[in-house]
Amino acid sequence: MASFGTSFMLTLISIVFMSIAPPVTSNRLTDTEIKHLCSKTNNLENCYKLLKSDPRTTNVDARGLAEVSVDLACKKANKIHSLINSFVNKSHDSRLKNIYKSCSSNYNDAIHDLKVIKNYLKSGAFKNIPVQVKDASDEIKQCKTVFGGATSDGAHIKKRNQEVEFLISIVEVTSSNLSKN
């Protein structure tokens, strides 16, 4: 009778621990799946390297990968936004200052869009993400267009815009994968 009680207790404990295990382990993305997602961007190699360089992608599910991609895009956009704001304050050329102000506003809006995406990821509102991705992308493209008229680009804003556009394309790919599930 004692062994039945012990067996029952061990079984019960096992069931409890298995139900507590995070769902990430059962839906972990393989390297092949990450490469397949990255193949939908304009640079598979850079996308894959970038995602795999983040330690959070070691054992991640599709939602986690999308969250990592949003974090990477947000981090880069915030860094560039700060740089642009510093040039707004330093510039003595009124035309260039206005271009920097316009781009700063675009980056502010793009960062807001990325934060909204992050909230949608947390809440599971995946179908709402594509609109925010497009909005964020459009904001960066607008900065690129406005900055295209600048005669000098000492801060390499055009190149930095391309980096953020690429990161947003990764967000688009990783999040669009979620809305199919």
Regions found by a protein language model. Name each.
Residues 1-29:
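Terminal membrane/secretory targeting segments in land-plant proteins
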Residues 24-181:
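Folded extracytoplasmic luminal domains of secretory or organellar precursors
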